[in-house]
């Protein structure tokens, strides 16, 4: 066993002595050592209940004849961090999480790992670590929260609360109505109830094969979560015995299938960023062109909030992720069904008995929302390395208008609230990319303000930053190269005409190459916003969004 490095041989007597101080007995040194990578943190509702989850996981691991050791990672709540400097720490926290898991697991030579993530950057951070460490691993997420209901009976979620702020600001609702939405938008523990980033990544974890069937949709408060925990321990023991590791599971074909599910569900645009980062950790050459190819062959089968009033509990009731995959499998060339997963079985075997139980929630292949996926990759002179739009969250397929330019999210939000943006405008928020932000903050506050003011179909928003999974409307993010790297977005001037064509996958500014070249010569890179601490180091090492915004190790040659 891998853990023999710290527990076998006369020279490991000091190691065993220390381990006995934790409560181990001599017989435990013949069992696999299992890392329980938890992410319990009280300020995040999606993680507040994970302390109890950790106890259940440890019980299940012991029952399976293995020895559990629990530790916790950090976490950032994107909703609470939204709209202020805290959001700059969100994406960088993914790297800290990956590094901390790598540190604990490799320093102590664990034989296997069970990861308990849930929210936005915690799930991909742990997934990156699992691929980097490459020991048998199973994921059991904390599960989504239920949707809420106002006193009037309206179904609401966190997106409703953010949009309520814009609606109140523009006089569309009263302060009492906003308070009602606030009080009921997040009714329980769990990841926010729509197809936002957390749930998108937990669903993708399931189809990638790192998590068990049901992981993406079973609610946090559902007793079936406890059954998943028991299964996870049993399956991990099988993976250890068969030496099946994350890199055996997360192949190029598995990533194809993850994006296929993403397209079928219209997941968060952040999934592109995180899954490209996973590919980097797995040593795979996977780029945005391949994502676009997946998008072209996968129909959009279900719309979940913010694209509709359906939530993860509805997906679960309608058959869950397995039912969506089973329906997708009817179309030739969409899924790779014979690859191995964390169950020890193939994807085909995992979904064999699944079925759609409500075709209003999960559409059939014969009745898709659209013939192509709910995410699109756009390219053009404004995004030579690509940009992403959640096409399933807007009915507008082509938009052309003049730029209204802001050099930060704070500046943009203030301008929107002061009425500086009008119908037909293209709002540009730049210098908010991985390096420029730094940290590529999410733009949920500006998009929610636009939607709440009733301009969601009449104003477009472009950024080199990110969008929350709760964002909707004509929102194009991840523009690469970013402004801080001298991308075309940095060269835009007030009033330039921008064209967004979702069907043709184009993002263009109506300015000649000659004029853009002239502007590039005159452009000067702004001083970094942060030069010290973690964010200062992050800004120096982070790569572009089109490669997952991972950290690049300096070349010391």
Swiss-Prot record:
Binding-site residues for [2Fe-2S] cluster, renumbered to this chain: 119, 192
Names of required cofactors: [2Fe-2S] cluster; Mg(2+)
The protein's name: Dihydroxy-acid dehydratase
PROSITE patterns: ILVD_EDD_1, ILVD_EDD_2
E.C. designation(s): 4.2.1.9
One Gene Ontology term from the biological process aspect of the record: L-valine biosynthetic process
Enzyme class per UniProt: lyase
Recorded superkingdom: Bacteria
Cofactor note: Binds 1 [2Fe-2S] cluster per subunit. This cluster acts as a Lewis acid cofactor.
Family (UniProt): Belongs to the IlvD/Edd family.
Pathway the protein contributes to: Amino-acid biosynthesis; L-isoleucine biosynthesis; L-isoleucine from 2-oxobutanoate: step 3/4; Amino-acid biosynthesis; L-valine biosynthesis; L-valine from pyruvate: step 3/4
Gene from which the chain derives: ilvD
Keywords: 2Fe-2S, Amino-acid biosynthesis, Branched-chain amino acid biosynthesis, Iron, Iron-sulfur, Lyase, Magnesium, Metal-binding
Organism encoding this protein: Bacillus anthracis
Alphabetized InterPro entries for the sequence: Dihydro-acid_dehy_C, DihydroxyA_deHydtase, DiOHA_6PGluconate_deHydtase_CS, ILV_EDD_C, ILV_EDD_N, IlvD/EDD_N
Catalytic reaction equation(s): (2R)-2,3-dihydroxy-3-methylbutanoate = 3-methyl-2-oxobutanoate + H2O; (2R,3R)-2,3-dihydroxy-3-methylpentanoate = (S)-3-methyl-2-oxopentanoate + H2O
Function: Functions in the biosynthesis of branched-chain amino acids. Catalyzes the dehydration of (2R,3R)-2,3-dihydroxy-3-methylpentanoate (2,3-dihydroxy-3-methylvalerate) into 2-oxo-3-methylpentanoate (2-oxo-3-methylvalerate) and of (2R)-2,3-dihydroxy-3-methylbutanoate (2,3-dihydroxyisovalerate) into 2-oxo-3-methylbutanoate (2-oxoisovalerate), the penultimate precursor to L-isoleucine and L-valine, respectively.
